[in-house]
Amino acid sequence: MAPVVRFAPSPTGYLHIGNARPALFNALFARRAGGRFVLRLDDTDTARSTPEFAAAIVEDLAWLGIVPDETLRQSDRIALYDAAAERLRAAGRLYPAYETSDELERRRRRQLGRGLPPVYDRAALRLTAEERAAFEAEGRRPHWRFRLDPGPVTWTDLVRGPCHVEADSLSDPVLVREDGSYLYTLPSVVDDAEIGITHVIRGEDHVTNTAVQIQIFRALGAAVPVFAHHNLLTTASGEGLSKRLGHLSLRGLRDQGYEPGAVASLAVLTGSSEAVRAVPDLDGLAALLDLAHVSRAPAKFDPHDLDQLNARLLHEMPLAAAAPRLAALGIPAAAAEPFWAAVRANLATFSDAAGWWRVVAGPAAPLIADPALAARAAALLPPEPWDATTWKSWTEAVKAATGLKGKALFLPLRLALTGLDHGPDLSGLLPLIGRERAQRRLRGEAA
């Protein structure tokens, strides 16, 4: 059976490279196996979820090349969660509790002070009907906890191998808040069961949560999916990534000029047994994805690696991929092929191409470091048409006429022709600059 997977972000902020990682793992897993990828927007937190962030998530995934086969919003599915909660209440697995957060905190501190684990003591299960009525009369509304079965919860994880969590070490989780709204846990299980999710691929910070959800799946009589808990992406210093790090948001990285392929390559291959390298498309990354090869150690994200991957993708980008973007920069189609061949090895971001086109087409302000050399070089410019051999034959003639060689010859010519002391090989740029513009620049004119 083809797998069905999902990515379930909360639309409370922009996606960053850290939560792009599970999105990519799921999308690539589905792509490799011919399965389906579902985007589920966990927007039940109405105070923090916004339509703008929801739209941004869809846009950012599209930038990475991920287009969901189906998109769902939890806010449209409340009736399903209500029905599931009623089933759990009827089965005695969901029970009301009336403690305030302050009362729970005091109880937790007492347990810690006595050297006990801070696990909820199920005091609510011992309340009499009269005690519950008294709480209701004073205005308290219950939150609802899921009663965990005792003993170990086990599963075979596609990343971590055999896993088990002792349910006795966990507090009965709150599934429904006092106002009737749902926390993440129950809606996630209900959706996974109703949609037919076969594999849940997510960060290792969900391992304990998985034990709880497995019990909820079983309590609802639903099939338990296969789980895979990958390592988390951190900063180079080991700090966890968060939505507060705006420069690492996908749109922040996009605005800085990074290619989606560079971001995807780093997000997927970091922290695995695969060498981190630039993979230009998702099909190539899907072929490399093997969850069994994902490390259990933290995956450290180094921006320097992203710079290198970005440059590599640009240096190897074929003209067919670059041509529409060159046209968008205003570069004529007739010049696109020779221009791209000349400059791509010097690009850190694609937008750098616009700067090199200004060097070619002008106006560029020349720097005349050696007026005598510039004048002699102008006089020796050969007639057009020019090609990639023109630079060599021309500079050999200038060398013979002036006796200059090496840096003393080439740097003044580069400064005069481009106004810069560095850049692409002039054998590729000179034919694009052209004879008339080259002559004017060698005379010190902006052209």
UniProtKB/Swiss-Prot annotation:
Superkingdom assignment: Bacteria
Residues spanned by motif 'HIGH' region: 9-19
Top enzyme category: ligase
GO biological process: glutamyl-tRNA aminoacylation
Swiss-Prot/TrEMBL catalytic activity: tRNA(Glu) + L-glutamate + ATP = L-glutamyl-tRNA(Glu) + AMP + diphosphate
Chief location: cytoplasm
Any one annotated GO CC term: cytosol
Entry EC number(s): 6.1.1.17
UniProt keyword annotation of Cytoplasm present: yes
GO molecular function list: ATP binding; glutamate-tRNA ligase activity; tRNA binding
Subunit structure: Monomer.
Role played: Catalyzes the attachment of glutamate to tRNA(Glu) in a two-step reaction: glutamate is first activated by ATP to form Glu-AMP and then transferred to the acceptor end of tRNA(Glu).
Protein name: Glutamate--tRNA ligase 2
Gene field: gltX2
